[in-house]
């Protein structure tokens, strides 16, 4: 049965989608069975895996709202499988209001897919609305990317408050898988200070691997591929390979 991990931080620009795409590809390269569930209407994770976000049908929106079979929506790529998204997902939170047990729609879909995978990663939207609540209800744990910049921890208190509410009433088993430092630059005091502050806030929960600031990580999505394929010898690719080893070791 799959380890279902939501990659979540409502603050935009922290490397959430980059992390979801590249950890999927890195674990696939280790021989793991991996599914990326794109739960963001921008569908950048879908296109980052080489899937055309404008033509995929059925997709995760159809699964949630129109009752499409989850397995029929899955697209296989050489980097891992994808449950794709598209812009229709933007209105899903409003459409969910009338659906009974709406917080668990994604959970029910992923339960059908989980026996086929070792890992399922959910790329969450940059907000704390019903789609994110669905992801938190479906996940067993959370991977929280934190950018090594000023105000890095801003908004995390809101995320943690939402997590506490979900644990109390909807998903008591939810835990933090790990906190990932992204866009790290060892040459700056700021990155080092942020890293220390994050470790103080999340003792024992911060990954040893840090993701460096790396231009190849920024370029790869425009080519529709993970950085591991775009530039396998880049510092970004090496960091995600190390993170995959770290996550894999946690689950052995």
What is each residue range found by the language model?
Residues 1-252:
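P-loop NTP-binding core
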């Amino acid at each position: 049965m799959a380890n279902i991990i939501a990659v979540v931080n409502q603050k935009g620009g922290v490397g959430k989608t980059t992390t979801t795409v590249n950890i999927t590809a890195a674990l696939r390269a280790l021989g793991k069975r991996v599914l990326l569930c794109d739960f963001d209407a921008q569908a950048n994770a879908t296109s980052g895996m080489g899937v055309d976000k404008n033509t995929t049908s059925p997709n995760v929106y159809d699964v949630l709202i129109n009752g499409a079979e989850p397995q029929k929506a899955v697209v296989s790529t050489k980097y891992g499988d994808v449950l794709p998204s598209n812009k229709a997902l933007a209105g899903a939170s409003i459409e969910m209001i009338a659906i009974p047990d709406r917080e668990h729609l994604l959970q029910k879909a992923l339960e059908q897919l989980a026996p086929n995978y070792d890992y399922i990663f959910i790329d969450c939207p940059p907000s704390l609305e019903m789609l994110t609540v669905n992801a938190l209800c479906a996940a067993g744990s959370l991977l929280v990317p934190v950018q090594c910049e000023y105000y890095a921890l801003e908004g995390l208190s809101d995320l943690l408050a939402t997590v506490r509410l979900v644990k109390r009433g909807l998903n008591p088993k939810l835990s933090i898988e790990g906190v990932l430092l992204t866009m790290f630059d060892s040459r700056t005091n700021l990155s080092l200070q942020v890293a220390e502050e994050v470790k103080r806030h999340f003792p024992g929960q911060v990954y040893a691997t840090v993701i460096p600031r790396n231009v190849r990580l920024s370029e790869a999505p425009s080519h529709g591929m993970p950085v591991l394929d775009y530039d396998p010898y880049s510092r970004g690719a090496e960091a995600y390979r190390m993170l995959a080893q770290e996550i894999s070791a946690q689950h052995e």
